Amino acid sequence: RYIGAGAVAAGGIISLIKSLPLICRTFAEAMKGIFNKEKIGKEERTNRDLNIGVVLGMLAILIILIAALPVIPIGILGAVIIVIFGFFFATVSSRMVGLVGSSNNPVSGMTIATLLFATVILKATGTTGITGMVGAISIGGIICIVAAIAGDASQDLKTGFIVGATPKKQQLGEIIGVVASAAAIGFVLYLLNEAWGYGTEKIPAAQATMMKMLVEGIMNAELPWALILVGVFIAIVVEILGIPVLPFAVSYTHLRAHETSLH
């Protein structure tokens, strides 16, 4: 499992590194587009967005809730990490998906990078133990959702632009859709956990298990680095052979988890 975790982590970082030139270019272009918005026909119906004040207000409310809710023990520091990583990765994700497609969205790499940074930062600031682990996984999970939804919204808005839709109405629809689906998905995940439990033979949850192992290992300084490095080198060899690293690594981790549950 630790070999698989090392391979998944390396695969995520490799995909992120390979995407860096496009990430930097798209981030710069996106920022340029924001600041030049006043010059490109703001009054046109097909260029009408939600009021930026409303967007910032909703964002502020969400950040305060995330920082204050006891079930998400991340505090102000965790909220700041989410704002920084979320802003950058949402911009990158939406732009890359809009230009190339969802297959080019390195969500796994972004999630793993956030998870590692968040765990190290929380540990360095004294937030350790179960609280630190839950906080780090919460931050990584939120950023994963941010990157995925940003890419999805980008595809929707791009399609809307092609057919002449109004962005503001689409954005309102996106908000309604996200809230409704979050409630439904949360309820389903709760039922699955109550029925079978994650990490069992029925629901191995390989990626979640890998995230747990990495966070626990960093927090407790108990990572078996020899096995992790074996996984890293396997990922590098697989990349050199031209095989997609992340699908290979996740499949390996899932297989090992399944074998362990059978034994």
Regions found by a protein language model. Give the residues of each.
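Hydrophobic core segments of alpha-helical transmembrane domains in multi-pass membrane transport
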Residues: 4-18, 55-68, 82-90, 115-121, ...
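Membrane-embedded translocation segments of transport machinery
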Residues: 66-154, 162
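Extracellular/periplasmic helix-exit of transmembrane alpha-helices
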Residues: 19, 104-107, 124-134, 184-205
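Conserved small/polar residues in nucleotide/adenosyl-binding loops
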Residues: 253-263
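Juxtamembrane inter-helical linkers in multi-pass membrane proteins
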Residues: 26-43, 202-209
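Cytosolic juxtamembrane amphipathic/interface segments immediately preceding
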Residues: 34-50, 162, 214
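Short amphipathic alpha-helical coupling elements at transmembrane boundaries
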Residues: 25, 29-32, 98, 155-162
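Membrane-interface alpha-helices at helix entry/exit sites of multi-pass transporters
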Residues: 165-176
